[in-house]
Amino acid sequence: WRMVWEQNVSTVIMATNTEERKEPKCAKYWPSGDPQSYGDLMVVNLGENHLVDYTIRSFSVQRAQGDSTMSIKRNITQYHFTSWPDFGVPKSPSGILKFLRKIKHSSPTGYGPIVV
């Protein structure tokens, strides 16, 4: 989250699931319910939209600024592709193409790089 903050990132892409055949594959780095602190950054999950091939999550990342009443807040969107099979490739490219189109048309300009 510190890198996301430092680079002024607004879009994060996750191209793998957290498990493969019920074994851990990728750490779940975002909060589901209660806000989570990462150093001086507080991450709040604002919501999730589960679609057929991917999930879109919205987060608020807030950084304390000196006095605890002063803070800076940014919104981050995570696009998580969930239809890639544990082994092999998808039967059809349509899901990944829709995913990429959504990211292309939804990512705002004027921010830092997209993090994958």
UniProtKB/Swiss-Prot annotation:
Domain Tyrosine-protein phosphatase as annotated: residue spans: 1-116
Gene3D superfamilies with a match to the protein in the record: Protein tyrosine phosphatase superfamily
Name recorded for this polypeptide: Tyrosine-protein phosphatase 10
InterPro entries given in the database record: Prot-tyrosine_phosphatase-like, Protein-Tyr_Phosphatase, PTP_cat
UniProt record similarity statement: Belongs to the protein-tyrosine phosphatase family.
Annotated EC: 3.1.3.48
Binding site for substrate: D86
Alphabetical keyword list: Hydrolase, Protein phosphatase
Catalytic activity: O-phospho-L-tyrosyl-[protein] + H2O = L-tyrosyl-[protein] + phosphate
Domain of life: Eukaryota
One annotated GO molecular function: protein tyrosine phosphatase activity
SUPFAM superfamilies: (Phosphotyrosine protein) phosphatases II
SMART domains, per database record: PTPc
Organism: Styela plicata (Wrinkled sea squirt)
